Regions:
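N-terminal small/glycine-rich loop or linker at the start of catalytic domains
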Residues: 8-25, 78-91, 114, 119
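Active-site beta-loop-alpha junctions enriched in small/polar residues
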Residues: 21, 51-53, 80-84, 120-123, ...
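Aromatic-lined glycan-binding groove of carbohydrate-active enzymes
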Residues: 184-224, 260
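Terminal-tail/helix-coil boundary detector
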Residues: 218-252, 256, 271-276, 283-285, ...
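Conserved, mostly hydrophobic/aromatic
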Residues: 6, 18, 33, 40, ...
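N-terminal binding-site loop/beta-alpha segment at the start of enzyme catalytic domains
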Residues: 1-75
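Structural preference for beta-strand elements that scaffold enzyme active sites
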Residues: 15-17, 46-47, 74-78, 114-117, ...
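Glycine/proline-rich, positively charged
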Residues: 42, 86-183, 187
């Protein structure tokens, strides 16, 4: 397993990390979740990413129980705030009160005194950015988080935060990024790098599409994410036949390189020095081990060129935000 420095922090994180949205929110049982987590440690993964909203606290609680049996300095733990945590729509967002309330609740569920990385899950344009930034800084000043990050912010929002608090405010950005979704390359990568911010990318396997498990003209496997109505909300475009046909053209490229489709997709993401870690989900331990094999793979220029030829104009390249992200900045 290779490790990379997370932005301007002193954290060294595995370039393959384990996320908990698929593992915990996808209905995977506790013992299977424990097995996936154990497999991650066996593979050298030391970076674990969750969020308060995953299962409305269930994901954090599960990892709190599982990870509490290991030395706290043996892993890097990240969580997020923003999502709606109850039936009350007001129980969400990035107000000072909500951030203060949710960090304490997250730490209780995670059974730890601090998280290594506390992230804004989305931007909240309904709250003055000054209030949000001051609240996040208070979390760090109180020792409840070591570093801060954000997910799915526009460059306008990132720049506004940096203008207020300086480039040392954030160490990480968490955008969607894969062969099929390249939106962060347009603007976010350059702004982040200029300010000491690394990328922790989610959905590097394109919601599983880049593993090759879905074929054009065929129904998705019954046990797959695409067949689960609770999990496939963001997959509509990815399941179009033209996208699946483009992904099918990657199959001989992976075969010739001696790689699985997943290894090819993860290595493609990790080719970028801006990326500190690629977050993968898992419902079975063998998936964790299989994805971890992508660490350290270097794709040749010929392979990279073949990928571009195969995908053509299929990937999203314009600066576009993922689901639920909102543009705009509010000031006091």
């Amino acid at each position: 397993m290779d490790y990379r420095r997370l932005g301007s922090s002193d954290l060294e994180v595995s370039d393959i990390s384990l996320g908990s949205w698929l593992t915990f929110a996808g209905g995977v049982g506790f013992e299977q979740t424990r097995a996936c987590t154990d497999a991650a440690f066996e593979a050298g993964i030391n970076f674990f990413d969750t969020a308060n909203v995953y299962g409305r606290g269930a994901a954090e609680s599960a990892w709190g129980e599982i990870l509490s049996g290991r030395p706290r300095d043996s892993y890097v733990l990240a969580t997020k705030v923003w999502g709606q945590m109850s039936d009350d729509p007001a129980d969400s967002g990035l107000s000072a009160a909500q951030i203060a309330k949710q960090i304490d609740a997250s730490l209780t569920r995670l059974r730890t005194d601090y998280v290594d990385l506390y992230q804004a899950h989305r931007f909240d344009p309904g709250v003055p950015i000054e209030e949000t930034i001051e609240a996040f800084q208070q979390v760090v000043d109180s020792g409840k988080a070591r570093y801060l990050g954000f997910s799915e912010w526009t460059t306008e929002q990132v720049q506004a935060a940096i203008d207020l608090a300086g480039p040392e405010l954030f160490v990480s950005s968490q955008p969607q990024y894969s062969m099929l979704w390249r939106a962060p390359e347009a603007e976010l990568f350059a702004l982040s790098t200029a300010n000491g911010i690394s990328q922790i990318v989610w959905s590097p396997l394109g919601q599983g599409v880049l593993t090759g498990k879905y074929r054009p003209g065929q129904a998705p496997p019954s046990d797959s994410r695409a067949a689960n109505s609770d999990m496939n909300v963001a997959m509509n475009r990815l399941m179009d036949d033209d996208v699946l046909e483009a992904v099918d053209r990657l199959r001989p490229i992976a075969d010739q390189a001696g790689l699985s489709m997943a290894e090819l997709a993860l290595a493609w993401v990790l080719r970028r020095p801006e990326v500190a870690s690629a977050i993968v989900g898992a419902s079975r331990p063998e998936q964790v081990h299989a994805n971890a094999k992508a660490s350290g793979i270097r794709l040749t220029p010929d392979v990279l060129a073949a990928i571009e030829d195969a995908l053509g104009d299929t990937p999203v390249t314009e600066p576009t935000l993922a689901t639920n992200a909102r543009p705009g900045v509010t000031h006091r």
